[in-house]
Amino acid sequence: MIKLVLLRHGESQWNRENRFTGWRDIDLSEKGLAEAANAGVLMKEEGLTFDIAYTSVLKRAIRTLWNALDTMDLLWVPVEKTWRLNERHYGSLQGLNKTETAQLHGEEQVLVWRRSYDTPPPPLEKTDERYPGNDPRYASLSSEEIPVAECLKDTVARFLPYWHETIAPQIKAGKKVLIVAHGNSLRALVKYLDNISEEDIVGINIPTGIPLVYELDDDLKPIRHYYLGDQEAAAKAAAAVANQAKG
């Protein structure tokens, strides 16, 4: 049986402050560092090991991966970083407090921006200092590849080619894979793996720092999936993600 492990980064400083983060490179909070280490403990207790790991080019995911692997004594595992695993780009909302944004625009509108499949938030101007085209880590990307705002549909479109061309072949070759990424890049993969509809993906929330194990058949079709550790705590953490924009 194939096991694929997905892990959303630990709590970031902006998660703690309830701000839209997107492609802004915000580090982990103290709680997030502890979550990352605890994720490593949970995976080690489960008897998991890895041959290769994938993560984004954002430090909150990279540091989560480091801390988890360090706890497992697996820092030697090869790591591939890709912008295709970045969080979805939240456009001009990046840096804004979610509750204050909901008070300004209404909870329903913010829910659409946060969780709908095909409605992006207001775009970022390319003259804005937050525009990723100004960041050297994206120097190899074309202007068409660099987003000014993304909906989940856009995130799926940029991630799935990497899944099919890079990650899936490694899994089929027998490699044990860990993916440490972000709420929406992982939702994009979960939507694909579980064949979740555009309507139902709105209700899927992934908590920080809790490993999600997928058991797959030889065609990489899911047999089942489950969070490691306390299931009730995982459910409460996922519900808390859903409530972030509420007052």
UniProtKB/Swiss-Prot annotation:
UniProt keyword annotation of Zinc-finger present: no
Disulfide linkage: none
GO molecular function annotation: phosphoglycerate mutase activity
Ranges that cross the membrane: none
Reaction catalysed by this enzyme: (2R)-2-phosphoglycerate = (2R)-3-phosphoglycerate
Biological processes annotated in GO: gluconeogenesis; glycolytic process
EC number(s) per entry: 5.4.2.11
Chain positions of site Transition state stabilizer: H182
SMART domains per record: PGAM
Keywords: Gluconeogenesis, Glycolysis, Isomerase
Active site: H9, E87
Binding site for substrate: 8-15, 21-22, 60, 87-90, 98, 114-115, 183-184
Pathway: Carbohydrate degradation; glycolysis; pyruvate from D-glyceraldehyde 3-phosphate: step 3/5
Claim: Isomerase is one of the keywords in the record: yes
Family: Belongs to the phosphoglycerate mutase family. BPG-dependent PGAM subfamily.
Function field: Catalyzes the interconversion of 2-phosphoglycerate and 3-phosphoglycerate.
Protein name in UniProt: 2,3-bisphosphoglycerate-dependent phosphoglycerate mutase
Species annotation: Prosthecochloris aestuarii (strain DSM 271 / SK 413)
Name of encoding gene: gpmA
